């Protein structure tokens, strides 16, 4: 099964802002980048998207261009929940909270947030469901950097602590086979 992992394009957030599950918009103009993304995708596919607008805008654009009947939003494709850190500048997060997370982001979470291992479990559930369907159509997943890194860890058996070795740039398309 072919899976295309697509990271949303740049957001309106200033650099240095923690915006995991906050529903922030996309920086404009984005149409040229969207066209570049589409050029890397199959002409027919099943499309899934995070329900956050920075992914949904791209999903709708792709749906219209490649004439896919529909796309499906799935909350398991949302970025990591950073809890009380959402929409704060990383530099404004107290070191006594941030440092332990930086040392072990896999198991430690922001207050009222989730850990990477929790995120990884939900991506694993999503992935298992798709694999069990045994579809012959490619799957396009429009999502976020944390989710892409998690999928790549599932795909390569890379330890979660090394997830940041997986590159996930804005607007990047990564094709994997399961």
Protein language model features and the residues they cover:
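Active-site-proximal alpha-helix that buttresses catalytic centers in soluble enzyme cores
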Residues: 3-69
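Domain-level recognition of soluble alpha/beta enzyme cores
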Residues: 158-178
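Histidine-centered catalytic micro-motifs
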Residues: 5-9, 142-147
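Residue-level preference for the first positions of well-ordered beta-strands
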Residues: 3, 136-142, 173
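GST superfamily/GST-like fold recognition
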Residues: 145-149, 172-174
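Short beta-strand scaffold positions
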Residues: 49-50, 121, 142-143
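Glycine-rich phosphate-binding loop signature in dinucleotide/nucleotide-binding domains
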Residues: 40-43, 130-138
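Phosphate-handling substructures
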Residues: 65-122
